[in-house]
From Swiss-Prot:
InterPro entries: LCL2. PANTHER family: LONG CHRONOLOGICAL LIFESPAN PROTEIN 2. This is Long chronological lifespan protein 2. Residues 1-19 form the signal peptide.
């Protein structure tokens, strides 16, 4: 009987610890998620745009202040390249090209230019 009581106490204590860790883990994550969601509200984006002191062109994705829209940087410069269209007025950011894999042509700025001209 004494062994049963000790085992019950140990199992009960383990359940309390597991319940505490479970609650702490998910409770903390939920609060973090709520903070993140609150910081990514459309009003925040709008306020950043409206409260900018940029006197030229404010890039919509990066909030960089540049002379003209084509001068905007890519939002992820470490993994994207900026390809300016032949009209020199517009651009697109694409994933940085990788080496030719299994004979598939590399998608780089030359590929974007061909697509712009309707050659693909």
């Amino acid at each position: 009987m004494r062994g049963f009581v000790v085992a019950t106490i140990i199992v009960g204590a383990a359940n309390c610890v597991m319940a505490f860790d479970f609650e702490q883990f998910f409770g903390g994550q939920n609060r973090q998620q709520q903070r993140t969601q609150q910081n990514n509200q459309p009003q925040d984006y709008e306020q950043q745009q409206l409260n900018s002191d940029c006197q030229k062109y404010l890039c919509p994705e990066t909030f960089a202040c540049v002379a003209k829209p084509v001068d905007c940087p890519c939002p992820f410069p470490q993994s994207q390249i900026k390809c300016v269209f032949p009209d020199k007025q517009n651009f697109v950011c694409i994933s940085s090209p990788v080496d030719n894999v299994n004979g598939v042509p590399v998608r780089d700025c030359k590929w974007v230019e061909k697509a712009w001209k309707g050659l693909l």
